[in-house]
Amino acid sequence: LSLVGSEMCIRDSNYMDVKPDSNRPSVAYFSMEYGLNHVLKIYSGGLGVLAGDYLKEASDSNVDLCAVGFLYRYGYFTQTLSMDGQQIANYEAQNFGQLPLDRVLDENGKQVVVDVPYLDYYVHAYLWRVNVGRISLYLLDTDNEMNSEFDRSITHQLYGGDWENRLKQEILLGIGGILTLKKLGIKKDVY
């Protein structure tokens, strides 16, 4: 039994050293949410759990994949009920310093900023990284002093706000995601 355990530890320690299979196309995966762990509140349910499972399986299957999404300040709400049975949505701010993620830094040690065009101005998003096995998940965060209060809220809540904010989220994910990969020098075969 201990020999089997030792062999498994050796095999698992080499797991992360294996390079992606270059015979398969490389992939850039974009999603509004990723269900990786309850600690990181960047998902609400089915789509997020599925997207998170894709990343975990890509890592296990040695697929050359990276992903882009959002680092939500408040995530999705937690639900409580009032005395008369009405739903109450509670939003709790995430403390990014206590989450399993890292700031993406440039060669000067400054956090990387992605500048995303919106009509006649730019929204500026900080870049964070979560390691999902061998897979890098890059998260965009607009809650910073470079943006107006209105644009800081783009990444406050998953699916939160009005239709305009939702459209801004979709622009940030699509255009901002491509700009993120370009800024990091990442090129993939399939998007």
Label each residue range with its predicted role.
Residues 13-15, 44, 84-131:
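Extended, Lys/Arg-enriched charged tracts that mediate electrostatic binding to polyanionic substrates
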Residues 20-38:
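Structured, charged N-terminal subsegments at the starts of enzyme catalytic cores
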Residues 34-39, 72-78, 145-149:
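Flexible loop/turn segments at secondary-structure boundaries
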Residues 37-68, 147, 154-191:
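A conserved hydrophobic secondary-structure block that centers on an alpha-helix together
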Residues 31, 67-71, 141-142:
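Glycine-rich, histidine-containing beta strand-loop boundary motifs that form or position
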Residues 108-179:
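Active-site cores of enzymes that catalyze phosphoryl transfer or operate on phosphate-rich substrates
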